[in-house]
Amino acid sequence: LQASREELVLRLAYLQFTADLRVKFQYNNLMFLTAGYLVEVLNHKSWEDSVRELILEPLDMKRTNFSVLVSEQDKDFARPYLYREKKMEKIPFRQITNTAPAGAINSSVREMSNWVIVHLNGGKFGERQLLVPSTLEDLHLPYMPISQTPPHAYVSPASYALGWFVDYYRGHQRVYHGGNIDGFSALVSLLPQEGYGF
């Protein structure tokens, strides 16, 4: 039996702290689940319906979905593979319905580029203003340092913003976030001041 989103969020009250608030960076997908559940409570509809209406439809992301079962019906979908014992092996899709806000969006490079455009174009897609510029600034603003040691000579120590990692490469701000699930990896990376994204 899988717990519902509400049950998972309510159980977080029993999660023991491993560090005080804002003392140590700790990435936790359950917080994305919590944010998704809050969207459901405030909008009186599922997280999926809210994302579809507020993001996917305005961005013309018609093939993007929340279920691997839907993805499998698409004429052009990717299959998950795992490199094991020196060979590529096809593995089953992993469906994460109850924790969908933490990583169940299935998309394509073409459709994800529309999401990137919004972040590089001051919140606009075509003629439609989806986010006000100050909201984008808030999303990309570092709130929590991750480390004090730079990973490379040309990259600053990273921080975490609102759903984005932020660092500086040779003085250029980089805003990025990856996602992984069995057989798949993805990365969205932006250089907002330069207007580049992939």
Role assignments for model-derived ranges:
Residues L1-D182, L187:
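Short, surface-exposed loop or secondary-structure junction motifs
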Residues F198:
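Active-site periphery "cap/insert" segments of enzyme catalytic domains
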